[in-house]
Amino acid sequence: MKLLVVGSGGREHAIAKKLLASKGVDQVFVAPGNDGMTLDGLDLVNIVVSEHSRLIAFAKENEISWAFIGPDDALAAGIVDDFNSAGLRAFGPTKAAAELEWSKDFAKEIMVKYNVPTAAYGTFSDFEKAKAYIEEQGAPIVVKADGLALGKGVVVAETVEQAVEAAQEMLLDNKFGDSGARVVIEEFLDGEEFSLFAFVNGDKFYIMPTAQDHKRAFDGDKGPNTGGMGAYAPVPHLPQSVVDTAVETIVRPVLEGMVAEGRPYLGVLYVGLILTADGPKVIEFNSRFGDPETQIILPRLTSDFAQNIDDIMMGIEPYITWQNDGVTLGVVVASEGYPLDYEKGVPLPEKTDGDIITYYAGAKFAENSELLLSNGGRVYMLVTTEDSVKAGQDKIYTQLAQQDTTGLFYRNDIGNKAIKE
């Protein structure tokens, strides 16, 4: 069986590597991928994510059994609909189902309609009305661009002035283009955040281990928001009862609601949750695997990944098993300056061997050379599975200390929250 993974980052590297390790899978193509993936025997296809017709033509020519769609913008642009219209299978939600991610206002409407716990909110396209709402509610308060903004469209404002400025940047200054033409303004929720992922087909879903991401650029959760600087799974200090509550009060009603709305969901659903004094509440939905969480969740899967996905798509009950001991922890290495301006072309250390997996996010071969250079904001991620968070930290940070990371940076405190508890 030949498979296609659409996307280019560390998430897609982890998905493609796991698929290639499955029985019955002979070849995995990644479009467009990045050069670091070739070190794991993956085949790159020079077609960008937005070129749906070229991807479909490639899939037909190469007798691809099905495609796994990685990035949010492809799903929001209807790539799954296009594959299905061409008679091809793709694992991911249709454009209508993916609206859970590409419109925060739509997600809020679904949650309100199906009684799913989330923050109180208002949606505005008029700046003066948004400003009046902010002044009425007070701070802290959260301002979100309605559409996709590369994970950077959320401002947690400590003051009313900050919130008004964020709303102005989105609504008047066009900071995120059409994505910020509407804003969702939410009450600030206090508590610890965690991620819950599920494989989904309609109202059938299969929960994955919990994960905790680290969004801020620098140690101590300082600095700007990023796509994510590291993660670990499972979250050892999170009681199973909280997960069970989240499944019954959030995941199940949302998926049943989507079926009732005529938008049945197929693919991976990410639920960003916060554990408040009133129990778990939804911060956001993503209509696909998270990055970097994929890179620490998939190494824990002990069943046949390709078979699992194939079964889920066919409506067959999958046999999914997970490693149930130890902790998988990963640290992202990014270009200095990320998530703002950064340089490309920094030489990268050699790929790790043994127990530490290297997933590449932004890597490119130097011309006529096997030397990998940085080619993005997040560059690579080191991942290991150990008995504890502490043991995972020791392993990864010892390895990083031995690598030449000139021109790159990483956080030194990934997993600390689990140790403090």
UniProtKB/Swiss-Prot annotation:
Keywords linked to the UniProt accession: ATP-binding, Ligase, Magnesium, Manganese, Metal-binding, Nucleotide-binding, Purine biosynthesis
SUPFAM superfamilies xrefs: Glutathione synthetase ATP-binding domain-like, PreATP-grasp domain, Rudiment single hybrid motif
Disulfide bonding pattern of the chain: none
Gene Ontology molecular-function annotations: ATP binding; metal ion binding; phosphoribosylamine-glycine ligase activity
SMART domains associated with the record: GARS_A, GARS_C
Sequence positions that bind ATP: 134-195
Reported cofactor(s): Mg(2+); Mn(2+)
Pfam family, one: GARS_N
Cofactor comment: Binds 1 Mg(2+) or Mn(2+) ion per subunit.
Reaction catalysis annotation: 5-phospho-beta-D-ribosylamine + glycine + ATP = N(1)-(5-phospho-beta-D-ribosyl)glycinamide + ADP + phosphate + H(+)
GO biological process: 'de novo' IMP biosynthetic process; purine nucleobase biosynthetic process
Span of domain ATP-grasp: 108-314
PANTHER family associated with the record: PHOSPHORIBOSYLAMINE--GLYCINE LIGASE, PHOSPHORIBOSYLAMINE--GLYCINE LIGASE, CHLOROPLASTIC
NCBIfam families, A to Z: purD
Name of the molecule in the record: Phosphoribosylamine--glycine ligase
Organism lineage: Bacteria, Bacillati, Bacillota, Bacilli, Lactobacillales
